[in-house]
Amino acid sequence: MRTIHRLVLTFCLGLAVFGCGKDRGGFEGPTVDAFHGRVTHNGNPVKFAEGEEVQLTVFHTSGRQFGIPLTADGAFQIGWMPIGKYAMMLERTPKNPGKGPTKTRYSVPSSLIIEEGKKDYVIELGKDFKP
């Protein structure tokens, strides 16, 4: 009986020491838990074709990259992400590529800065973006 009590106590202490929080993918440093936003072109909302797969790939200054899926109206919602500055690339995959390109990429000229406490972001795609 003592062995069972020791095992239970050891397990509980392990949870207390190591925690059972969210997996941060091995990232060490400050993060935000959730945020949302949208992409714009010349200050106007962007619409993507229904069924088109659109992702904003962001590159943290630490070298880590993350994919942010966008909805047809250019909106996004994300769980955790490291605080800091990001370079960005917009990737679009058409619903039915046919004979055209299977994926197009656009380098977003501005950078994204994730800040502690900020929950809403607007990302301007820049004057050279072609809807």
Regions inferred by a protein language model and the residue ranges of each:
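Structured interaction patches on ligand/partner-binding surfaces of diverse proteins
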Residues: 94-120
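A glycine-anchored, Pro-Gly-centered beta-turn/N-cap motif
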Residues: 82-85, 117
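A short, solvent-exposed beta-strand micro-motif common in secreted/extracellular proteins
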Residues: 84-98
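Beta-strand-rich domain onsets/edges
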Residues: 17-35, 99-104, 129
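Structural motif
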Residues: 38-50
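Sec-dependent bacterial lipoprotein signal peptides
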Residues: 1-18
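Short, surface-exposed beta-strand/beta-hairpin micro-motifs centered on an aromatic residue
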Residues: 66, 71-80
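Short amphipathic beta-strand segments in non-cytosolic proteins
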Residues: 50-67
